[in-house]
Curated annotation (Swiss-Prot):
May glycosylate diterpenes or flavonols in leaves. CDD domains: GT1_Gtf-like (cd03784). Its EC number is 2.4.1.-. The keyword 4Fe-4S does not apply. Signal peptide: none annotated. It is an enzyme of class 2 (transferase). This is UDP-glycosyltransferase 88B1. The lineage of its organism: Eukaryota, Viridiplantae, Streptophyta, Embryophyta, Tracheophyta. UDP-alpha-D-glucose binds at residues 278, 340-341, 358-366, 380-383. Keywords: Glycosyltransferase, Transferase. It comes from Stevia rebaudiana (Stevia).
Length: 461
């Protein structure tokens, strides 16, 4: 008998890959007859290494197979812009993906192909093979409202976002100031803007869009999507909110990891955790402001510091990038670690009471699940939009004062960290959402119901 397969196709980069792997685990857990193949694009631009993560998943999760696509040299006239490459590279790989899907189809039944939105180019391939094709939107329902509304925004607003200085009205979400739109969309005639619009149009024609969120977290956005109000000039695709999908922190040894050992010695809910994602780096001037603000706040802290961009490839020391004597002066109350920390395990630790975050959606969901209130410090991509949702709509984060170019003063860090750790409103709200997040993925919960609606056609053919 032919085996049944679900094909997942993420874009390069650890953030999108982790979400896809968690989706693969969910599919197999509830439908053991379905095995999962993840197509892996070579990282031809800097996305953060995925090798260790893939090796770990391969060892612990045998029902997920990683199929590494061969390296194809980039044409000499390729764009040097990251966002253009993110769309152009999948286009380059379409012939390889076509042959791969045909080869898999010879020995297995492909029940579904699930695409990351950056690999939109593959939509024409899977549809040409008459395969049910879905998009996995790694952000939330509010972000999906904005994304599906992009073609309408394109027609409605004549100027570029960078020049508008106005609020963009999007059904289902609070008004978004034009300066808070992703910078890759600032120029409506740019390749990146046009690629996002193409992807949005293809999403509307797909078998469905899967989003990593849950109904109770984003009720207004979810209702807008289900009512078809995000797309104004055609039918809307089925929407499936199946989250929260997050990596668990259970695989980290609390007695071996430096961060967790230190947290074990701290009082309950006393530590503010600062971490800014795999691509979140600051210049030395900003690192020093954060350090001064933390020290003045008097709060306990665990801070992940990445190498400043000006330091090139050389190794760096904390004393080289932080104020003189800072690490020594704060060692009783704080721990600074370089480059990486086990974020889900830290957010799930009893001692952590606050999170200064870049507003990446995976990180935001982890904070919601573990009930840790946030300070919103967006850095890139759609994170400024996420800040609006998290602060104004969902009310689980605090706004952080920053200059027009994104610089944050020591005073703003001190003030907002204190407000976060001493305040009750946001803490109570996120604890309420944490309870609802857990209920959503239990039997009969909203996300579980959506998930079985999604997979029903895959298992009854």
């Amino acid at each position: 008998m032919e085996s049944s397969k679900v094909i997942l196709y993420p874009s390069p980069g650890i953030g999108h890959l982790v979400s896809m792997v968690e989706l693969g685990k969910l599919i197999h857990t509830h439908h053991p007859s379905l095995s999962v193949i993840i197509l892996v694009l070579p990282a031809t631009y800097e996305t953060g290494s995925t090798t260790t993560y893939i090796n770990t998943v391969s060892t612990t999760t045998p029902f997920i197979t990683f199929h590494h696509l061969p390296v194809i040299p980039l044409p000499p006239d390729s764009s040097s812009e990251f966002i253009d490459l993110a769309f152009d590279i999948p286009q380059l790989y379409n012939p390889v993906v076509y042959n791969t899907l045909v080869a898999i189809s010879e020995t297995s039944t492909i029940k579904a192909v699930i695409l990351d939105f950056f690999v939109n180019a593959a939509f024409q391939i899977s549809k040409s093979l008459d395969l049910p094709t879905y998009y996995f939107f790694t952000s939330g329902a509010s972000g999906l409202c904005a994304f599906l509304h992009l073609p309408t925004i394109y027609k409605t607003y004549s100027g570029n976002f960078k020049d508008l200085d106005t609020f963009i009205n999007i059904p289902g979400v609070p008004p978004i100031h034009s300066s808070d739109m992703p910078t890759v969309l600032f120029d409506k005639e740019s390749n990146s803007y046009k690629n996002f619009v193409k992807t949005s149009n293809n999403m509307a024609k797909s078998s469905g869009v899967i989003a990593n969120s849950f109904l109770q977290l984003e009720e207004r956005a979810a209702q807008t999507l289900r009512d078809g109000k995000s797309i104004t000039d055609g039918p809307s695709p089925p929407i499936y909110l199946i989250g929260p999908l997050i990596a668990s922190g259970n695989q980290v040894d609390h007695n071996e990891n430096e961060c967790l050992k230190w947290l074990n010695t701290q009082p309950s809910k006393s530590v503010v955790f600062l971490c800014f994602g795999s691509q979140g780096v600051f210049k030395k001037e900003q690192l020093k402001e954060i350090a001064v603000g933390l020290e003045r706040s008097g709060q306990r802290f665990l801070w992940v510091v990445r190498k400043p961009p000006s330091d090139g490839g050389k190794e760096f020391g904390l004393d080289d990038v932080l104020p003189e004597g800072f690490v020594a002066r704060t060692k009783e109350k704080g721990l600074v670690v370089k480059n990486w920390a086990p974020q889900p395990a830290i957010l799930g630790h009893e001692s952590v009471g606050g999170f200064v975050s870049h507003c990446g959606w995976n990180s935001s969901l982890e904070a919601v699940v573990f009930g840790v209130p946030m300070v919103a410090w967006p850095l890139y991509a759609e994170q400024k939009m996420n800040r609006v949702y998290l602060v104004e709509e969902i009310k689980v984060a605090l706004w952080l004062r920053m200059s027009a170019d994104g610089f944050v003063s020591a005073e703003a860090v001190e003030e907002t960290v204190r407000q976060l750790m001493d305040g009750r409103r946001v803490r109570e709200r996120i604890l309420e959402m944490s309870t609802k997040a857990k209920a959503a993925v239990e039997d009969g919960g909203s996300s579980r119901v959506d998930f079985f609606k999604l997979t029903e056609s895959w298992t009854h053919k």
